[in-house]
Structures are given as C-alpha cells and as structure tokens.
A protein has these predicted regions:
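Hydrophobic core
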Residues: 9-17, 219
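Conserved active-site-adjacent core of cysteine acyl-enzyme catalytic domains
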Residues: 145, 193-202, 206, 210-217
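Sec-dependent signal peptide recognition
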Residues: 2-8
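Catalytic cysteine-centered active-site loop
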Residues: 192-198, 205, 226-236
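Alpha-helix capping and helix-loop boundary segments enriched in small/acidic/polar residues
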Residues: 62, 78, 202-206, 230
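Secondary-structure boundary elements
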Residues: 146-200
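Hydrophobic/aromatic-rich core segments of domains that either
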Residues: 210-274
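N-terminal accessory/pre-domain segments preceding catalytic cores
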Residues: 13, 19-169
Length: 274
C-alpha cells in the first residue's frame, strides 16, 4: 500500500509493539504417518551438510526474541532449513499454531531469504506422553539454483548503495542515505507478485514489502539493528515498514511513504519527522 501525495520518513519513537495477527503463513496439514515422521527426524542432519545461499543475519532477531524460549529452538531449526533451501520435512516438537508463529517470526527477521515467503505444508501428530509434533516442509518462491544465481545482483546493489555512503559517519547519516538511495532507484508498482527485496534490487520496482525488506537488509548489513513491521496503512490496506535503532532509541521508518507520487503521477521524495 502506498499513500498518494506527501508522505514520510517516519522517525517516531517506538512506544508500542507491532502486531502479527492475520499474517501467519498459510499451508496444508494432515495426520502424520510413521514414515513421514522418520523422514522428518533425519532432515536436520541432511540440512546441516548444505551451504547457506546467503549469509544469515544475526544483527537483529527481534521477532525471535518475542517467542517463548521453548519455541526459539523450533525457530532456529526452521531458520537453518530456510537458509539452505532445505526441501525435506523437518520434525519439531510444537503444535501447528506454534509452528506458524515461528514461521511468521522467521519471515520478519530474515529479508535475506528472498526465496522464502513463510509458506509451508504441515503434517501433525499427537503422541500420548510425548505430546504434539509437527512435520514441516518449507515451500519456496524459486529453486535453489535460481536463488543462488541472483546473489551477485544483490551484492552489486548493496555495493552501489554503500558507495553513496562514503561520507556518512553516524548511523543517522547511513539510515538517511539508504532511505534516499532506495527511493531514487525504485518505482512503486502494484502488479509485482514478488514481495521480497529481490524485485527492488534486480528490477528496481516493488511494493511496500519490497521497499521495507530492502531497507531492512541494508541496515543489517551495516550492523544497524532493524526489523520489519507489518500492519495496515491508510484505508485499512496491508502495509509494511521498518523500525530501526538510532542513537540508542528505536524509530519507525517508512521508505514507501517517503517515495510519493502526486495526483499527476509525478514522483518525489518526502521527509517528515514526527
């Protein structure tokens, strides 16, 4: 969702959290067979042998930190599976609802997994004494070979952006520089199916999710803590923006609304500190 007319680099001190209701990954589920559960038990070892397609960021894992401690292990296993584009089912000791919470958190924390949008299929089982378990098979928007082939373009976009920050000395200057670079090099379009950062970086176009994930990725690469916020904008339309740390405080930044168009369709850049 993009607001027409003036909009914002919203640098508003964060006083409330970001809700994730209505944003849980979708998938199918059925009762587990013994063979399926056995296959899921061996998936972790299989995935550990594979290289990551992109370096996994650990600068800011805000959504993971909101999970109960017992679910963070489930998150970590699904995290590694997504990082290596693992296609085998993974068994976790969690209910279906808990798995979906972990996948939502994973989607928020890791913009670098541009091949994964939180989708998965599920096989559930409930064993007396042992409790609930779920076999999870992640699904991807592209195959591993395609994702790997796009990494040089991601690296080139990052370099081009960071080259413009040569004079930036403070985190604020870096935040503003990345914000302005994305706006100057991206066209907002509604017909983009891909909601990751890859369309912004390779085709220079995207929706609010693409803007926000690109900003988040670049902040994390600079070592600046940043997370993704998902909610609604004007008109109750779904919207994505960022929350970034600067000078010890957390602020909201909306790159999409900082890249407005007026009623004539003319582009522009907007800065609004509130």
């Amino acid at each position: 969702m993009k607001r027409i007319v003036s909009a914002a680099l919203l640098m508003t001190c964060l006083l409330t959290g970001c809700g994730m209701s209505g944003l849980l990954p979708q998938g199918s589920t059925h009762a587990a067979s013994q063979n399926e559960l056995y296959a899921a038990q061996t998936a972790k070892e299989t995935h550990e042998l594979r290289p990551q397609l992109m370096e996994t960021q650990t600068v800011c894992l805000w959504a993971r930190e909101q999970l109960p401690e017992e679910l963070q292990a489930t998150y970590d296993l699904l995290d590694h599976t997504a990082a290596v584009h693992g296609e085998e089912p993974v068994q976790v000791e969690a209910t279906l609802e808990e798995v979906r919470r972990c996948l939502s958190a994973l989607r928020i924390d890791h913009p670098e997994y541009f091949w994964f949008d939180g989708a998965a299929s599920y096989t559930t089982a409930s064993v007396p004494i042992l409790g609930d378990s779920t076999s999870v098979t992640l699904t991807y928007t592209m195959d591993a070979e395609t994702a790997r082939s796009l990494k040089p373009q991601v690296d080139a976009y990052e370099k081009a952006c960071f080259d413009t920050l040569a004079a930036a000395q403070t985190d604020y200057q870096k935040i503003l520089g990345v914000y302005q670079y994305i706006i100057a090099n991206t066209d907002y379009v509604l017909d983009v199916q891909d909601q990751s950062m890859i369309c912004v970086m390779t085709e220079h176009r995207g929706t609010c999710a693409g803007y926000a994930k690109t900003f988040q990725y670049l902040m994390l690469r600079l070592g600046i803590p940043c997370t993704l916020a998902l909610g609604t904008g004007e008109g109750s339309e779904s919207h994505g923006w960022n929350i970034v740390e600067c000078g010890g405080d957390w602020y909201q930044v909306d790159v999409t609304w900082g890249d407005p168009v007026d009623e004539t369709g003319a582009p522009g850049t907007s800065l609004d500190y509130t």
